[in-house]
């Protein structure tokens, strides 16, 4: 089986458009919430947390359910469409509590399709090619995450307001739904066996979930780094210029991610998935340290490099490592659990980080994130799970 096949390419291209959609929105959303709607940083954490929590619940169900049906694709298409609908509501929003509803709806759609998409991707290639397939997908995914913020940066710099950006973001959102529906196919797989579906997931998988959960609690949303980017540039720039610099940080971190995604997948196939993932956890810890002590353009660039380097590596290698630990017929359930744990951890992370950021200070929030993520990297390195 060729690893670069119709499904790998189709899922990748569709997610390129999907990421252009929501990353265009997310590049400016924390700035829209704080500068546009006048909300505190705590509101950013609450919005991120509610979105991640609602997504986690849906992920657990969709992964479990997709192992019991033969038509995963239809559910995934519905998930893509729901995300576009939720983000589209932002064009009419006037208060930050309304953002909570729109963000939750959008991320429920993401939760519906994410485990299914990952299971479809894993079911489309042989195990020896999982790293390359997930790395290629993440590279296209991150390319979309580069296009979206670039468009947001250009629109914001040319005098357009936040709502104009939300309107433009609907275009790639609609494109992603159409592309996924037309190009991808449900991979052939064994008929679901009710007995095998009741067998517990293997011990190696649960061994991985411990560092995944610890990292997730420390790995707060990139929105906080965007806020921090604006803060560390405020002494040198006007507020408007600092906001543009923060969007530039978001764009730069996605550019780094696009560059490292595929090489990281190749490296994971040849060096080992667990060591590469552990290293990515530690890189995020280093990014938090830079956010605490750094100032000016150098800190902004270094923070973009570190945050950008770890993000796609974590996403792709967690997926390929999970695929190597679980039998194909249980992949939907496994990805549901993986994404569910990540979602619950992200909920805790965003709410705690937002509260600490608002009531204690950014340094404490970033310091706690660094400690937790470094600990997760050490645990994963010492207790590496064995593939099935």
Where are each of the predicted segments found?
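Intracellular juxtamembrane helix-capping segments at the cytosolic ends
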Residues: 112-125, 313-326
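Helix-loop boundary and gating motifs at the non-cytosolic
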Residues: 2-52, 207-242, 246
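Transmembrane alpha-helix termini and helix-breaking/packing motifs in multi-pass membrane transporters
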Residues: 31-36, 147-164, 348-364
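C-terminal membrane-cytosol helix-exit motif in multi-pass small-molecule transporters
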Residues: 170-190, 376-384
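Helix-loop junctions at membrane interfaces in 12-TM secondary transporters
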Residues: 91-102, 292-303
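Structural signature of the two symmetry-related core transmembrane helices
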Residues: 74-88, 170, 275-290, 370
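Residue-level signature of mid-helix packing/kink "hotspots" within the transmembrane helices
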Residues: 52-60, 146, 254-262, 343-347
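Helix-to-loop junctions at the C-terminal end of transmembrane segments
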Residues: 58-71, 259-272, 357
């Amino acid at each position: 089986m060729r690893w670069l096949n119709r499904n790998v390419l189709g899922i990748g291209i569709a997610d390129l458009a999907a990421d252009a959609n929501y990353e265009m929105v997310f590049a400016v959303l924390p700035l829209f919430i704080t500068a546009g709607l006048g909300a505190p940083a705590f509101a950013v954490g609450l919005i991120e947390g509610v979105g991640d929590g609602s997504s986690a619940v849906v992920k657990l169900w969709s992964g479990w359910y997709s192992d019991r049906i033969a038509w995963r694709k239809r559910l995934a298409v519905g998930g893509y469409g729901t995300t576009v609908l939720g983000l589209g509501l932002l064009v009419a929003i006037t208060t930050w509590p309304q953002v909570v509803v729109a963000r939750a709806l959008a991320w429920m759609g993401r939760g519906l399709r994410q485990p299914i998409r990952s299971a479809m991707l894993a079911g489309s290639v042989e195990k020896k090619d999982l790293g390359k397939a997930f790395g290629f997908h993440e590279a296209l995914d991150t390319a979309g995450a580069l296009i979206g913020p670039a468009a947001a940066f250009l629109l914001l710099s040319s005098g357009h307001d936040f709502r104009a950006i939300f309107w433009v973001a609907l275009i790639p959102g609609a494109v992603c739904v159409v592309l996924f529906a037309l190009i991808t196919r449900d991979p052939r797989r064994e008929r679901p066996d009710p007995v095998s579906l009741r067998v517990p997931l293997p011990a190696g998988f649960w061994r991985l979930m411990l560092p995944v959960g610890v990292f997730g609690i420390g790995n707060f949303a990139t929105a906080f780094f965007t806020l921090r980017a604006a803060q560390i540039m405020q002494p040198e720039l006007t507020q408007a210029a600092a906001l543009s610099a923060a969007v530039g940080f978001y764009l730069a971190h996605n550019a780094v991610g696009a560059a490292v995604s595929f090489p990281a997948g190749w490296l994971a196939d040849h060096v080992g998935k667990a060591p590469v993932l552990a290293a990515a956890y530690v890189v995020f810890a280093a990014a938090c340290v830079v956010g605490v002590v750094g100032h000016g353009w150098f800190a902004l660039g270094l923070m973009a490099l570190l945050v950008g380097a770890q993000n796609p590596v974590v996403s792709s290698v967690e997926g390929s490592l999970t695929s190597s630990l679980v039998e194909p017929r249980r992949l939907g359930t496994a990805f549901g659990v993986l994404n569910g744990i990540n979602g619950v951890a992200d909920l805790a992370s965003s709410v705690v980080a937002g509260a600490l950021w608002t009531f204690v200070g950014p340094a404490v929030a970033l310091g706690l994130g660094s400690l937790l993520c470094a600990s997760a990297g050490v645990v994963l390195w010492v207790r590496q799970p064995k593939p099935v």
